[in-house]
A protein has these predicted regions:
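Short glycine-rich His-centered loop
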Residues: 3-23
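Active-site-proximal helix/loop segments of hydrolytic enzymes
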Residues: 2-4, 24, 28-150
Length: 152
């Protein structure tokens, strides 16, 4: 039986651009990534839902409740890290509520897969205070993909 996932393009709307680097906004990159990843997953037979498909703002709590109401199997929130200066730091870091269970395995697998295409694996870290990880009922991962200075 196919499973379902909700993809969250981090940030959004006029009030929350996320990280900004030389005019590039995290909210735009995360939306492109979420839509692209969603298309790949749908082509694999996975039921994909999104917290947003346009440039709108929802609070992290609203996103978590949306995922809970949709009764999806998994939740992945996509973000991009930033760095205050030009540098060559790039990688993937995944955040989970705690370092156990399916969510932790998912995060490790996401990082490992991105490592195979050139991302530095910056590890999986527990962030129990993040609302989208704390309030979702299903396994949830927040993925920090690359840096905002790197074009996607």
């Amino acid at each position: 039986m196919p499973y379902s996932i909700m993809l969250d393009a981090g940030h959004g709307g006029a009030r929350d651009p996320g990280a900004v680097y030389n005019g590039r906004r995290e909210k735009d990159d995360t939306l492109k990534l979420a839509l692209g990843i969603g298309e790949i997953l749908q082509n694999q037979g996975i039921d994909v839902e999104y917290t947003r498909t346009t440039d709108v703002y929802e609070t992290p709590y609203e996103k978590a409740m949306e995922a809970n109401e949709a009764d999806v199997d998994y939740f992945v929130s996509i973000h991009r890290n930033s760095f205050p200066t030009d540098n060559q730091v790039s990688g993937v870091e995944s955040l989970v509520y705690d370092l156990s269970g399916i969510k932790y395995e998912m995060a490790q697998n996401i990082n490992a897969q991105l490592e195979t295409i050139g991302f530095v694996n910056l590890g999986v870290k527990a962030r129990p205070n993040l609302v989208v990880l704390k309030k979702t009922k299903m396994p949830a991962v927040l993925v920090e993909v690359g840096l905002s200075l790197i074009h996607i």
